[in-house]
């Protein structure tokens, strides 16, 4: 009873916070999560090998994906490469230790293949999240597989303190390895996207003759400053990954999630006369510390989206959420790309002045996340609002009955399904419409649509019989209204819920990897179109 009263009180507070929320949620919005495997943060809870461990790991993943489906999440970013390892059978990397307890040990199954399959069963996109460069967070002795020892012997690695170690971004073989790893994932698995996080060069790497990469810089820089030289190598890696994806499966969405502040007047912002720099007090530390220049990736059109980690609240003194969100919305639109914000679950309450620090999200500040979603929607200039939540375990309560951020988001922001924003800068094949759509015993069926390796999904709508086809259309001209959107399916059939099996007509649309939705085909519609 006390938990129910507490949850009710939280909802009242959030309602007061969010009086400005739109009456209807947008049809187009990315809703995603970071599904973290490094240190087994989100998954798996069970570490080991053998039939019992495998069954437990699979069940944990299925339970998690059920939670995400219940929250109307549109994609899951599954971490498949955290420290130059793999959560799948790789030709280039050893198996991760975070699955079995020992690096290089085959678990006897393929978590990425399973995650893709289970996501798609639930109508959720599966994106492969990779850390491109990181090798170790605790020294050279951490990993001792033959693969890792070979990398040490052959000079692949770079560090400034002997503890945090990365692949050397300036080495051609390192760049090629990253491209090859991405290629094997994009070619070998039906992933819908690829996402890099915010780790590039080792933090605080020297920029003088004491630097570990100074000899290479001196021999190959052609007069560039060492900072520009390092950033250029990161930029080249990003471009080569993007080019590979375009040549392989161009409907796979590719983006990066850098630190939140970039494009300031004193760093990269000065390059663009028509793009006002990011105007917050917080520094653009990543530009000269880890040599990350996110605005350059937008300018060079080597990513489809940017997802800066705006892990600060709307009231933060030096890095407030609103102005940073507004800047990235402008920057992404300026260069013809998408901006989806990355949020930190629990960050708001941890930084409230005078508030005691606590583990996990505080129900008293759940409204902060609703305000951030509203900012995304308000500032988008190209109908491409979106959110990626870190870490996804913070979205739902640890115990039955607990209040959770996900409950609040579901009530005020995500109470209808959404489609991801449309990729408008690529030429997509015309997949047309489904054929032979029919309804029998509560199951909608239609012929499968295929076009090479193109991602093909379907949207299913259930519209009350009293609503005409014309009245069911969205006011902004984007097909049928999202309030009638019943499901997204990767299969060419769908079991209707019992409450939707009578009193409705139905529509099925082809929905591709670029998020284009094609002409609806109706079933049991009696009126005029």
Stretches found by the model and what they are:
Residues 56-85, 188-192, 302-306:
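Catalytic domains of carbohydrate-active enzymes, especially glycoside hydrolases
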Residues 291-317, 331-426:
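Substrate-binding cleft of secreted/luminal carbohydrate-active enzymes
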Residues 457-501:
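Recognizes extended acidic, P/S/T-rich segments that occur
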Residues 71-107, 210, 305:
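Aromatic-lined carbohydrate-binding/catalytic grooves of carbohydrate-active enzymes
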Residues 441-453:
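Conserved aromatic anchor
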Residues 74, 81, 146, 152-302, ...:
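Polysaccharide-binding and catalytic clefts of secreted carbohydrate-active enzymes
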Residues 464, 496-519:
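Beta-strand-rich modules
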């Amino acid at each position: 009873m006390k938990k129910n009263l507490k949850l009710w009180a939280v909802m009242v507070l959030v309602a007061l916070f969010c009086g400005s929320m739109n009456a209807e949620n947008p049809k187009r919005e990315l809703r995603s999560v970071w599904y973290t495997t490094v240190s087994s943060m989100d998954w798996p809870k069970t570490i080991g090998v053998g039939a019992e461990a495998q069954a437990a790991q699979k069940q944990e993943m299925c339970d998690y994906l059920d939670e995400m489906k219940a929250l109307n999440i549109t994609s899951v970013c599954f971490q498949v490469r955290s420290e130059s390892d793999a959560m799948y059978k790789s030709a280039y990397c050893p198996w991760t230790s975070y699955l079995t307890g020992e690096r290089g040990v085959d678990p006897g199954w393929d978590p990425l293949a399973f995650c893709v399959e289970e996501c798609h069963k639930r109508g959720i996109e599966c994106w492969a999240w990779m850390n491109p460069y990181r090798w170790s967070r605790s020294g050279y002795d951490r990993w001792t597989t033959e693969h890792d020892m070979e990398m040490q012997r052959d000079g692949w690695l770079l560090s400034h303190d002997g503890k945090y170690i990365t692949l050397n971004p300036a080495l051609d073989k390192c760049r090629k390895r990253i491209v090859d790893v991405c290629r094997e994932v994009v070619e070998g698995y039906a992933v819908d996207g690829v996402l890099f996080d915010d780790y590039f060069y080792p933090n605080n790497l020297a920029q003088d003759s004491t630097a570990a990469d100074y000899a290479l810089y001196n021999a190959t820089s052609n007069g560039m400053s060492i900072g520009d030289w390092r950033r250029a190598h990161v930029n080249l890696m990003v471009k080569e990954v993007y080019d590979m994806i375009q040549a392989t499966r161009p409907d796979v969405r590719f983006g990066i999630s850098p630190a939140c502040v970039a494009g300031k007047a004193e760093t990269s912002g000065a390059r663009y006369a028509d793009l006002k720099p990011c105007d917050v007090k917080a520094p653009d530390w990543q530009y000269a510390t880890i040599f990350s220049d996110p605005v350059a990736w937008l300018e060079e059109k080597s990513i489809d989206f940017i997802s800066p980690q705006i892990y600060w609240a709307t009231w933060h003194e030096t890095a407030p959420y609103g102005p940073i969100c507004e800047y990235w919305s402008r920057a992404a639109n300026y260069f013809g790309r998408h901006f989806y914000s990355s949020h930190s679950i629990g960050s708001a309450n941890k930084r409230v002045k005078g508030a005691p620090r606590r583990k996990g999200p505080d129900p008293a500040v759940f409204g902060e996340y609703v305000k951030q979603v509203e900012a995304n929607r308000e500032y988008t200039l190209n109908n491409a609002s979106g959110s990626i939540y870190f870490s996804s375990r913070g979205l739902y309560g640890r115990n039955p009955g607990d209040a959770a951020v996900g409950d609040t988001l579901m009530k005020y922001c995500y109470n209808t399904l959404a489609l991801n924003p449309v990729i408008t800068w690529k030429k997509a094949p015309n997949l047309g419409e489904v054929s032979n759509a029919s309804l029998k015993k509560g199951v909608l069926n239609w012929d499968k649509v295929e076009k090479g390796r193109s991602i093909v999904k379907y949207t299913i709508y259930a519209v009350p019989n009293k609503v005409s086809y014309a009245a069911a259309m969205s006011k902004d001209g984007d097909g049928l209204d999202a309030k009638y959107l019943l499901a997204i399916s990767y299969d060419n059939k769908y079991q209707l819920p019992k409450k939707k099996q009578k009193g409705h007509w139905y529509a099925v649309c082809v929905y591709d990897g670029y998020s284009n939705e094609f002409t609806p085909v109706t079933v049991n519609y009696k009126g005029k179109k």
